Structure formats: C-alpha cells, structure tokens
Amino acid sequence: MSKSTSTGTSTRTTRLLDLAIGAAAVRAADPGGLRFTERQLYYETCRVLSPAAPLLRRVPGTPPPALRLPSFTRALNARGRETVPGLLPSAPPQATPADLARSRPSEPDLYDYGLPRLLLCQDRSIAAMLLANHVHLEAACPVLAAPDALPLAPLLLAALERADGATVHVLHDASPEGVQLPARVRAALGPVPGVRVGSLGLVPRHAAALRLPSGRGPAPGPAAGADWPAALRPREAAWLARGRFAQVAAVPPARLVRTVLRLTRGPRPPRDSMWGELNGLRTAGFMTWPTA
C-alpha cells in the first residue's frame, strides 16, 4: 500500500470515528441533557459502530467491543474533549473517610437524623456521573465512591444505624473484583445492627442479558472464587475465572440512571428500565434475573 493510500485510509477512519463520537454523544445525553463519562461515551460509540446490535438485543451474550479503547481515546483527543457537550471531566477523588470524620457538613444537624439508604459505587467516575445527574437528590440517597468512602466515617455509620433498617446499595462491575465488593462492604461496616448491604449488580448474567461489551483481564488466582457470592451460577463463575469483565459504564446512561433511581427509591410502578422484570433483590443482596 502506498503512503498516500495509507494516509487517505487513516483520514477516512479518523473522520468516521469523529462522526461516530458526535452521534454517540447525542445518544448518551438523551433524554434531557444527561451528563456522561468518557468511558460511557466510548461504549456508546461502540454501539453506534455496531448497526446490527438492535437486532441482537434479545440474544444474550457479551460481545467484544466494536472499537479498541486506544483508538477511541486518540480520536477523542484529536476531536477535543471540550467539543463534546455533556462529557464530564475526569472524576477527582472524593473526600476520604478521615476528611469526613474531621469535618462537619454545612448543615450541622445532617447526621443527627437517620440515613435510610446509601449508594456506594466501585467506579469513581460512575459515582461522579450519578451525582452530576442529581440522582442523589431525586433518590434522597447519598452517592459515594467505594475506594474513597471505605471504611465509612463514624458519622455515616451512626446515621445508618439510627435509620433502623437502612440499606447500603453497592453498584459494581461484573468482574472478579466487582462481585467481591458487597462482601468487602459488609466486612468494612462491621457489626452495625439493622444495616443491610445489597448488590445492585452487575453480575455476568446481567451483562449477558443486556448484551454489554466485555473485556478480558488477567485471570484471578485459584483462591479468588472462594470470596465470590454463592448466588453466582457455575457458568458465571467460570466466565469470571477466565478474567472476563463487563463494566457498569457499558450500560446506556439513561438506563443506568433510571435503574439506580428505581432500585434505591424502592418499589415504583413498572417502568422501562434495565431490570424492569426483576422480582426484587435476594436476601443476600443479589438481583435475580428472569429465566430465559
């Protein structure tokens, strides 16, 4: 291939990716101008580049992404992040538990009341996205990034205990590390009476039902499975044991917001949401998926 031909092909590819990113940004922000993360934009771009995806949405599976992440990053850098409406900046670290313990909130009596629910996110950027879209206000549920919030500050623990029946919701990837997070949260809470830890997902069967793109990382060690939830099915455990993963960021932003609101606020009339047909949460905190 001549140098001029190679240059022309590269230019066309760059132009195609630029158009795909623009279309993906419009879709990610719909409805109502949602804010979204760079990784969410990446997965939305993959959907734009997969025109057959809508035809296969009822066929369970975890296909590979249509676009390599480095190619997307180069295209986004060439376009300029500032040209993408709705794209959030990289999420800064939240206040650490020590910071929370040292400082009182602007409302002096905030922690004097019971806190019936709290949402912990494995991914800092997902926590920032939910906050940017005011999920914490609509659900009356604080949203924190687990890496920064654990162990929880004593003030938060006291507020959860005071609520008498509080739930700490955990939103995590379908990954070897993600499925262990609810157990880590339970251990970090310690013996707090009346506080329940519930997983909102993802687990591999959610990822397959939603046809989320999946990746592959290093396979976990042989002992890793001992810490995985008993509710995992054998084929899910085998999927994770191969180092496979699907990220919460792969869920379309609007669907993610609807689902988190629905599950953190409690029962609501049926809506078109990511887990609209679920019967509820298992006692252990795992979501059940309708049998195909």
Model-derived regions: residue spans:
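Nucleic-acid enzyme cleavage-core boundary/entry regions
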Residues: 1-166, 176-292
